[in-house]
Amino acid sequence: MSESVARREPRVASATAPIYLVLFPIPVVCFLAALATDVAYSATAFLMWLHFSEWLIAAGLVVGALAALALLVEFLASRAIRTGGLGWGHLVLFYGALLVELFNAFIHTIDGWTAVVPTGMTLSIVAAILALGAVGTLFRVPVTWVAHREPRR
């Protein structure tokens, strides 16, 4: 390893970046798990799966709202984030997933079969696709929020 590479120290571009990157996976996992429990409910008709979906969607929305706030702060504060890196695509996909899941939460409050089949499951599928698309934008640019300084002499 060359000397210049060994001396580089990664620095976070802003204070909200680590918060967002820690919070972002939680709603994605909750939304995917809600889709899985919707599929389980449609296959078994056990009311337990409907209640699992409700709780997973609620948890995803609560943590997702915190992540969305951190993303908005970072997005508005950093021109580099808006023009490159994550960009508008990530923002639209993540906020879209949250909006779809908000509607899905209201649909899931209906008791019984109609809460999931077909509307609730359709909304869960759409939200899962949007959330996975937002995850995909993170890997498009692998070092979005990390900047390297030149070594001090």
Regions found by a protein language model. Give the residues of each.
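Membrane-helix boundary connector in multi-pass membrane proteins
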Residues: L102-T122
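Short, highly charged, low-complexity non-transmembrane loops/tails of multi-pass membrane proteins
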Residues: W145-R153
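Membrane-water interface at the C-terminal end of transmembrane alpha helices
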Residues: I129-V146
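Canonical alpha-helical transmembrane segments
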Residues: V63-A77
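Loop-to-transmembrane helix junctions at the membrane interface
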Residues: V73-Y95
